[in-house]
Amino acid sequence: MNISNIKIMLLGSGELGKEFIIAAQRLGIHTIVVDRYKNAPAMQVAHESYVIDMLNSDALEQLILAKNPTYIVPEIEAINTDSLVKLEAHNFNIIPCAKATKLTMDRQGIRALAAQQLNLQTSKFAFANSEQEYLDVIQSIGLPFVIKPVMSSSGKGQSIVKEHNEIKKAWDYAQNGSRGHAKGVIVEQFIDFDYEITLLTVRHKDGTSFCDPIGHIQKDGDYRFSWQPHTMPDTALAKSQEIAKEITDALGGYGVFGVELFIKGDEVFFNEVSPRPHDTGMVTLISQNINEFELHLRAIVGLPIPDIQTLQPSASAAILLEGDTANASICGIDKALADANVDIRIFGKKEIHGKRRMGVVLAKAQNTHIALETSKQALAHIHLTK
């Protein structure tokens, strides 16, 4: 295999894409990245970068035809997936495949696959395309429930509704968080689960591999902390791996899939799946012998994937900062790095208008509890320059 002849085009240039591009650069692979704005994180480390509206089919197809990449790797959902389906039919290699990208871009498609075709256990759910339909389905779902836009990213528009006086506010919040022109929502019965995990699942030429389960804490629908390994009963872990393999086999293609699951005792409920590295999986930058971005790259280009090992208990903490500036300056990194068990990634984003994830703290320790506390202590030092 001569990987120096490979060209990878990344559609989306966020922080996860940046780590993926770094992994590709280390192996001498030519990298091209695309996003809707200049100087996005992955653009800062790629050979070539382009700014286009990836929902515009003409712009997207013209760029791909002009650059003729070996692999096209979607990093975000805001892409014209019909174009990817068409390009795949003309022998372009979409990762993991156009079907997976299209199905997982909206919650209605993936929930139909999981619950109706594969009969995986999920929470009770219903879809609504108007506020009146939303009010109607609440009657059958009952309180408390979770509402999410059918199309959104990074937890935008998600909320848990526990009281009747929160119902209208939750609808409005979902509409504001929805991507594009989609107004639909999914309403799910709230599961009083014991914990939730991400099971990073790698489909590659030699089969399917699993990383150790990653525990995480979400707030406002977005990841704040994660840790690995998350200790769980053997029965629940086996069920989790079975579900993850079933859903990823149905989607097809090669690469890393982030499978989100709720665990209650030995019961496992499917929640969501992303056909790409997962934000909670940033902990693997410090915890594993091969991190999730390297695993994604290896699976895509056909490199060997040996045993995936968790080297030590580890945790990550999202650096979520709040402000209103076009030139963010971050302080406190020196204090955070005074601990030998701490590492940091700053993503290179300059603009903040409200809250924005600007980096991640990584910590290792003799157990995940201490690693999580260490990450929180380091996080407390980091802030915007006043």
UniProtKB/Swiss-Prot annotation:
It catalyses: N(1)-(5-phospho-beta-D-ribosyl)glycinamide + formate + ATP = N(2)-formyl-N(1)-(5-phospho-beta-D-ribosyl)glycinamide + ADP + phosphate + H(+). Keywords: ATP-binding, Ligase, Magnesium, Metal-binding, Nucleotide-binding, Purine biosynthesis. One of its GO terms (molecular function) is phosphoribosylglycinamide formyltransferase 2 activity. The keyword Glycoprotein does not apply. One of its GO terms (biological process) is 'de novo' IMP biosynthetic process. The keyword Secreted does not apply. Belongs to the PurK/PurT family. Homodimer. NCBIfam families: PRK09288.1, purT. This is Formate-dependent phosphoribosylglycinamide formyltransferase. It comes from Francisella tularensis subsp. tularensis (strain WY96-3418). The lineage of its organism: Bacteria, Pseudomonadati, Pseudomonadota, Gammaproteobacteria, Thiotrichales.
